[in-house]
């Protein structure tokens, strides 16, 4: 106990020495200094015991604390020296900031955005861009379509554009023209000239404008060609000039230096020309835009585009009227419904819709109504019947092997004689006169007489050497006839009515779709009155139609047959020529060779001539020989 009391002052001294070595701003603990004497033994002993225990712990703990504190101080000092947030180091320590770089986009802002706006903005001065009245002729160098809001011009040709404002803009205002692509997939590309025009000598020599610029200003030395350093877009700027006295427009002459179809340039991509009214600081006071096309023929392209636009408008209006029908929901057919067969037509999209067509004129309306009814009836006809009809039409439309003469058609040859010879109408039946006599040994020549023998046309020779097989075959009649009406060689309606002396009535028939005499064969006089034909022509036309019906048969008239001795000259009937042009022969020239025996010799008596029907006394008295007369054409 005494030893402990004796060592107490030494322990207190050691603790005070250690305590004094600590920093005064320690935040861990604070011990009061010893101010008591040795008279408080119990308290000193308690304190010495406390110090004794703290002596062993404080030696190691405080040493570690000092080491940790010094390390933290060094780290904090290093961090503070490199931190830009400390105000005392902010001015001295250089920082790697993008704002301090001279090439930063934030340091020098672009006067134009990356994607320029093409929305019309009249602004406070009611900025407008107009064009003069232009022509759509092919020779025009430029033209403007108000319908499409599109400018068409030739390359390097002057295109005047008028600028109008309601109030004068501030001094220093300029007008900028900039081309941009119209479509969204091309709008980020810069519009430039193609390499061919940019590097060529044409339109580049002696020009102050850069070769790559598409738009140039003509006749203004104050124009400036701007290449944006950020977006790369090219534009031309001219100072705004107020309109002259007596005018309300300021005209600027622009040139477009590359075609829209140039490869490597615009390459057929549509462009917009943006005209802006700007101040010196780039503030936009007004904006107008229009589409531009640089081509070789502005008038032609404008007309084609406007026609296409009108067609699209008509289709859009038609679809808008029938919008309810076109928006029907698709319904799948139930499994029980059979699939469409091969003979059933598949309707295209829109076949069930109803469309409207405006027609001017009653006659045009009636024609279109007939077409409509025909098409509707066509849908009711079975497809096999339609195919059969088309095959028949193709057979009827095959060209004939014989070329018709210049003044009348010829009958095509027959391949078969339908119904036999007894069923074919003879020449006498065709002409409508009875034969003078009939004989099995002589052909039925009917009313063939001297008058008919003198008519013009090809002769039909009778060859005695022809066999029966040749006589049974159908021969082609080479008669070139010019028959008078109503037996007209041309089946057209015009020739028929002209032959009747009624050319003024042609329009009454053609307006109703009647183009051939075959369409008139079933008309009555009441039908002619319904067609509004004048009364003075009705009876004439009706009689002509009756003569046609009685004169020849359209379905059987085919061609003339001839034989050497007993063949009947007739026209064969065939259904294959129902719609071909049929010529009806009215006048014939027949040459028949008569062999007269030489009975006028010394041994010939007068009674030998009785069977020939000659006046024998006159022949003997005058001694006139019987001669056969031939024309020069027949001799050669």
Swiss-Prot record:
What upregulates it?
Not induced by DNA damage. Isoforms lacking the transactivation domain block gene induction.
GO aspect biological process, one term: positive regulation of MAPK cascade
* Any one Pfam family match given in the protein's UniProt record, by short name: P53
Q: In which tissues is it expressed?
A: Expressed in striatal neurons of patients with Huntington disease (at protein level). Brain, kidney, placenta, colon, heart, liver, spleen, skeletal muscle, prostate, thymus and pancreas. Highly expressed in fetal tissue. Expressed in the respiratory epithelium.
- Consequence of substituting residue 487 to A: Loss of interaction with WWOX
User: What are the record keywords, sorted?
Assistant: Activator, Apoptosis, Cell cycle, Ciliopathy, Cytoplasm, Disease variant, DNA-binding, Host-virus interaction, Isopeptide bond, Lissencephaly, Metal-binding, Nucleus, Phosphoprotein, Primary ciliary dyskinesia, Transcription, Transcription regulation, Tumor suppressor, Ubl conjugation, Zinc
Q: Where is this region: Disordered?
A: 78-104, 314-345
| Extent of motif PPxY motif | 483-487
Locate the Phosphotyrosine modifications and list their residues. 28, 99
The UniProt record gives the binding positions of Zn(2+) as 194, 197, 258, 262
Q: Let me see what the UniProt entry remarks about domains.
A: Possesses an acidic transactivation domain, a central DNA binding domain and a C-terminal oligomerization domain that binds to the ABL1 tyrosine kinase SH3 domain. The PPxY motif mediates interaction with WWOX.
Q: In its UniProt entry, what is this protein called? A: Tumor protein p73
Question: What is the scientific name of the source organism?
Answer: Homo sapiens (Human)
Q: What is the lineage of its organism?
A: Eukaryota, Metazoa, Chordata, Craniata, Vertebrata
């Amino acid at each position: 106990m005494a030893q402990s009391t004796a060592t107490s002052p030494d322990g207190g001294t050691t603790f005070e020495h250690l305590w004094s070595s600590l920093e005064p701003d320690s935040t861990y603990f604070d011990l009061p200094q010893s101010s008591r004497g040795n008279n408080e033994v119990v308290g000193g002993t308690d304190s010495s015991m406390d110090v004794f225990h703290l002596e062993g712990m404080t030696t190691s703990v405080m040493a570690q604390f000092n080491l940790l504190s010094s390390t933290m101080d060094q780290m904090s000092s290093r961090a503070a020296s490199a931190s830009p947030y400390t105000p005392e180091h902010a001015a001295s320590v250089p920082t790697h900031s993008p704002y301090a770089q001279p090439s930063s986009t934030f340091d020098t802002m672009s006067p134009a955005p990356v994607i320029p706006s093409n929305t019309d903005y009249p602004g406070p001065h009611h900025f407008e861009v107009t064009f003069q009245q232009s022509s759509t002729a092919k020779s025009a160098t430029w033209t403007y379509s108000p319908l499409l809001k599109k400018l068409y011009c030739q390359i390097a040709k002057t295109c005047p554009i008028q600028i109008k404002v309601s109030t004068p803009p501030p001094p220093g205002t300029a007008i900028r023209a900039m081309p941009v692509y119209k479509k969204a997939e091309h709008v980020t590309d810069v519009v430039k000239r193609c390499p061919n025009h940019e590097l060529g000598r044409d339109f580049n020599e002696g020009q102050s404008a850069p070769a790559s610029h598409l738009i140039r200003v003509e006749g203004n030395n104050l124009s400036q060609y701007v290449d944006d350093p950020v977006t790369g877009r090219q534009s031309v700027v001219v100072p705004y000039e107020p309109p002259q006295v007596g005018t309300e427009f300021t005209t600027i002459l622009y040139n477009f230096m590359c075609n829209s179809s140039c490869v490597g340039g615009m390459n057929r991509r549509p462009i917009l020309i943006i005209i802006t009214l700007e101040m010196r600081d780039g503030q936009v006071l007004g904006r107008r835009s229009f589409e531009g096309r640089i081509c070789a023929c502005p008038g032609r392209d404008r007309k084609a585009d406007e026609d296409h636009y009108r067609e699209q408008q008509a289709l859009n209006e038609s679809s808008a009227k029938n919008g309810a029908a076109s928006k029907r929901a698709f319904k799948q057919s139930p499994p029980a419904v059979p699939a469409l067969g091969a003979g059933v037509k598949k309707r295209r999209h829109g076949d069930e819709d109803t469309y409207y067509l405006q027609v001017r004129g009653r006659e045009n309306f009636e024609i279109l109504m007939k077409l409509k009814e025909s098409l509707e009836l066509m849908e009711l006809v079975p497809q096999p019947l339609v195919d059969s009809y088309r095959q028949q039409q193709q057979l009827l439309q095959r060209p004939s092997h014989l070329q018709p003469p210049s003044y009348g058609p010829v009958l095509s040859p027959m391949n078969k004689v339908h119904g036999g010879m007894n069923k074919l109408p003879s020449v006498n039946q065709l002409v409508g006169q009875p034969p003078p006599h009939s004989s099995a040994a002589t052909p039925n020549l009917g009313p063939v007489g001297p008058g008919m023998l003198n008519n013009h046309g090809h002769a039909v020779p009778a060859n005695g050497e022809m066999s029966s097989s040749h006589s049974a075959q159908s021969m082609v009649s080479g008669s070139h006839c010019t028959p008078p009406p109503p037996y007209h060689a041309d089946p057209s309606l015009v020739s028929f009515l002209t032959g009747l002396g009624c050319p003024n009535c042609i329009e009454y028939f053609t307006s109703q779709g009647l183009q051939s005499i075959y369409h008139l064969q079933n008309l009555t006089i009441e039908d002619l009155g319904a067609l509004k034909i004048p009364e003075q022509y009705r009876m004439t036309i009706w009689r002509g139609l009756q003569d046609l019906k009685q004169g020849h048969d359209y379905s059987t008239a085919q061609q003339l047959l001839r034989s050497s001795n007993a063949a009947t000259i007739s026209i064969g009937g065939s259904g294959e020529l129902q719609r071909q042009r049929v010529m009806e022969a009215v006048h014939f020239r027949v040459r028949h060779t008569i062999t007269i025996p030489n009975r006028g010799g010394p041994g010939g008596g007068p009674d030998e001539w009785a069977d020939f029907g000659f006046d024998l006394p006159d022949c003997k008295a005058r001694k006139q020989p019987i001669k056969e007369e031939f024309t020069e054409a027949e001799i050669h």
